Amino acid sequence: GGNGGNGAAGGNGAIGGTGGAGGVPANQGGNSALGTQPVGGDGGDGGNGGTGGTGGRGGDGGSGGAGGASGWLMGNGGNGGNGGTGGSGGVGGNGGIGGDGAGGGNATSTSSIPFDAHGGNGGAGGDAGHGGTGGDGGDGGHAGTGGRGGLLAGQHANSGNGGGGGTGGAGGTHGTPGSGNAGGTGTGNADSTNGGPGSDGLGGDAFNGSRGTDGNPG
């Protein structure tokens, strides 16, 4: 996905574009070897949010594209775009929110043991702008959820990690840091084992300020 445009003076940055979905190849079926099975394409990464104009808020990051499904290996979900940086001047603008990670592709094969794709990671929160009173850091994006297991005892994939919180702005009074979001959740089919949860997002740091709150694990 494309990056969002920068905001005019005092304006907010544009939201980044969503990443394209991964391709879905034809399922060849059968019990052929792993190397002959089709592989789904990875989802595109979301675009970064634009930088806010003077005093303006940074744009939010775009979401990652979904991973493509296939008969054997699935494409991974795209990563969320990073939040845009807040504009400087007067009171610094707040950082944009990180884009959400996309879910991994799901297994579709019934002829062999499938492997799941991983969910995309959440984009990092944008940094706050400097000057006057620092703006608050943006929160990290939400992690993508791992793809579901296939019909024949597939191992479920791990979920994506939560995006880290943005950094608080400097100057005058320091802004508060952003908070990390929770990791994604793995959900398998009845005959599949669940994958591990995504890691919790880390809170952002402020210059000479307190640290942000960590997200909860999935």
Residue ranges of predicted features:
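Glycine-centric low-complexity repeats
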Residues: 1-218
